[in-house]
């Protein structure tokens, strides 16, 4: 026999161990930093977000969760944080050609006008709370330090002493204070993010900078308080840390605090009291806290559209959800400062186009280029040697396109968009290869241009953007989990140039970049108001500044949809510092609480009442109207785009001097309700803006957003329906097997974390070999030598007789799943535990079990906080949560095993929205501990090696599997395989087994065991040698919990079949969805090789599946690196398992 190649298990184990050690080391370095461009339920600090680095081909089978139109191929920039850790891209040192600032060239928010009136922040202190900073950057500079609030370190120390602050260092005249509130004593790996954010707020680069234009923040002459905070000991501790930073910033004199980080979808109500008090303290002192809305788009993340049946798809979390904060969304203006390239067109005209480059091309050099299709095949690159490869976006990852071009001899890559009006995308750095991204329009021009040369210019210019004015697709939508209106306002956040570590500058994108601009504007506006309204208290000036800034914002209009972007996406609109500075009027709700109107639930007809405030000495005449709109629906999904319904007519109003007046606008959307309810059966938003002009033909003067919900928002379903109830076998995050819709595979050692996400009950499948070992006294499961493992599966699912790799839902005649357990302590289907995909945040989740009379026999502990499963991504959160506290092991309140019978397992929970009522979901669970009755004797034919049992097994539950197991030594591991019955019920026993190396092992009769399991998980195993002796099994030889000759004296109500145990019929197993009985496979007789894992001796340390180690409600602080370690670990185990499976399956088919 040919010697088979030995599988490198030892090498894999070494690689696995090394990987684990390295990842643990990296975990120690990075601590718990989770950035908002990698959205997380436990995320910490938001990093540049929407610069996608790879592309994926949409699955042709994806029917439930199509990709968003703007994100057709790329895996959104959830890898931006990883890119920050890669080798930096080469940048050409450009001598200073001008002392002009970036804002001199492009100022979409019109900050310069406000700076001229309020100064540039001299004498003011601003604070930035973030994950890390380069505290010695060249941009941290004061033009005139004699105007600074803190003239010296001694001044700072005096202020610290007054407020009992014993920590924090003076860095220089600009950075008056720096402290690490994380208390981990480590240097932040990510210094980019906080440095970039601080530069937008208060950067002040010197004229000697190597950049062509000088960075100047919104408040360049303000002093900085840099406060490092990141997750170290959990979210609650993290929130307390940034609360302490807020208090210190206020006490040290900060006028504004920027917080560009967040925890997606978390509710303000769940923050620690210390954090809420810190927000209130800042407000009382007139200190503005500005937060980023987040980069998590909406429910489903950036690659899925939310379902039209579930309108609560907002993901703005904390701290942005706090009412006292000013929460900022991101948009792209119609013009941008950008790198450029020039081409000579067919008519000999010079055409400039914007480019976003990674590893810049040599400036002012003419490059030849050649078209290379989508850069997938070798033939695409036949003409690119020594030239730039022009490649269309799509089909494969950007990095693969670049690598392919480099391999073909290209000197650079130009990738053009495959969709119109798309956003620029930062390409990955592949071996320092020059690469740049351009628009589709410019790419097609290059493709058709007869002169195939291009020149990259040294100096950036302001050019129109391909997208036009547009909300960033990554910017998080409201409402908040509490049901409040957020975000408040929008600012540019796409490709923003600012400072990064080591005296460098770079473009980053994200709401992180939008917030500090607004923070600077707020600081300047409050400075203006100190002079303009000296009699006001600081808190009154803060309140006025926030209302004026929101009122003067310009509502952004979607030219494609001919409607305004939703207030749940843009807030009040794009910030306009010039309008805010000049404003003498503003608009609020009728109670003068804020400059937004939350109507909560509305009917088809309702009214919007607002208050117009006039702070001038003259009466003001205005015209007003309201826009009415809702969500656009595409098929079964929200399109994340607005749908205009109608606009009211313009009306006239006069507001007396130094006074206010209310305006009421009647809305009637009844003519749209039939069509809208057909598209959104659970209700829909009716929203828009009440807009004011001094003349109907002139530009908008001010506006206020309003939001109402036509339906019952508070009582929308919080939980996705169970997967058992799905007609096509799919859920939002789960794509059904088209050939077997009821297939729900267990976890095993395969990493199904991104796959098994739906609402269901879980349980465990425990093989008889492990049950036997435990019964024989092995206390530590790691000491059990077996090729089989304990596996987490879904209640009501069963494998086939000869294939343990797939599980299928088995149903009763009424269609409900056959969820049955046998809580006898053997670890096999002993319990059920709840797993849910939550569509909304909820509170007070509890599981309880009711008997057939409706009496509660058991109640779980309460899970107080449940966060919606807004994404299915290892970098953020999974598409379902397993609740450890809901595990029911078949016992009552007193810890006694309940009687056999059918019970209702109920999960209760309440949405956290105002006015919500408790909801619940029920599952039927059968409990049955009845001992199996099996044959006590058998005969064996030596001629054909057939084993014939004296009788068929009997039980109160259908038989799941009846098999002959045999165990042999393969190297140092006992390996178990199974034999399925022949059509006549006999078993053909093999004479030998084959090892992984191809060696044969003779089998003795003592190697064989008869194993029977029913659908409740009761297992009995008997050595074949005992069957052949014709003797009844003794208790110590029998695998069941009781001796076969000592049947329990069951009362009628204790029998799961509804009959008394002494009158049990020969139960015929029910059939599963495939039309066959689970475990029964016709025309078998050959050995059915176990598909459990060859290397599970090493893997058994995990006991349960890898999936159960993922974050649960009791383990909410597991972060991205911990998930990465788990992925790597289970990947290696899965690889070994796959090799073993493949080998065994091939042998079985021989």
UniProtKB/Swiss-Prot annotation:
GO terms for biological process: proteolysis. Residues 1114-1150 form a propeptide. It catalyses: The primary cleavage site is at 67-His-|-Lys-68 in human C5a with a minor secondary cleavage site at 58-Ala-|-Ser-59. The active site is at residues 130, 193, 512. Its EC number is 3.4.21.110. Residues 1029-1054, 1061-1073 have a biased composition (Basic and acidic residues). The keyword Secreted applies. It comes from the Bacteria. Keywords: Cell wall, Hydrolase, Peptidoglycan-anchor, Protease, Repeat, Secreted, Serine protease, Signal, Virulence. Residues 1075-1089 have a biased composition (Polar residues). It holds the Pfam family ScpA_C. It is found in: Secreted, Cell wall. Cleaved by SpeB protease; leading to its degradation. Degradation by SpeB is probably strictly regulated to preserve integrity of C5a peptidase. Residues 1-31 form the signal peptide. Sequence repeats lie at residues 1034-1050, 1051-1067, 1068-1084. Residues 1034-1084 are annotated as: 3 X 17 AA tandem repeats. This virulence factor of S.pyogenes specifically cleaves the human serum chemotaxin C5a at '68-Lys-|-Asp-69' bond near its C-terminus, destroying its ability to serve as a chemoattractant. This is C5a peptidase. The lineage of its organism: Bacteria, Bacillati, Bacillota, Bacilli, Lactobacillales.
